[in-house]
Amino acid sequence: MRTSAPPAGDHALVQIVDAALADATRRSGPWLVCRPECAQCCMGVFSISQLDAVRLQQGLDDLQRHDSQRAAALRKRALEAVTRLSPAFPGDPKTGILADDDHAEQLFADFANDEPCPVLDPATGTCDLYSARPITCRAFGPPVRSEDGLGVCELCFHGATDEQIAACEMEVDPDEIESKLLKEMQDAGGPSGRTIVAFAVAD
């Protein structure tokens, strides 16, 4: 099920996350080596929310309006990815929704770790839907805390101490706006469950 547009609050969420990224980037200084064409974080499948999926779909619609050739190439990459990934997809390959049981989560941990994101343009090494990218992508690079502790990109913070890394921590969504927007979408009859980028932009 495709929703026409993200809820109104998504724009504010993106602004908050992007501001947090800018602040963490400033504090990180030269330890943060992210740059255009550094696409290591674009390799390997990761889960996204339905809010991310709708934002990507809107971004693809916008791309279609001003560069239909790039949009068609992106859709082709996504369809090819769905074809490759569907046989072992730990969820429903018809809907693209990931299963949320423990066994499926274990399977997903080792699923398609070498698969390039279909939104990544292989010719330029840059994201074709950068302004519409998922929250995970917006928070990659600076230190971000999860249940496993404080994680950083393996290419960044070489030589930094634990204290220096902690001082650059990025708080992604402290007010849990994303969770509220997802509930709003579900209450309005939108899909629930997590998916992956390829399924989000293949239709």
For each feature predicted by the language model, list its residue ranges:
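Short loop/turn segments that flank or connect secondary-structure elements
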Residues: 1-203
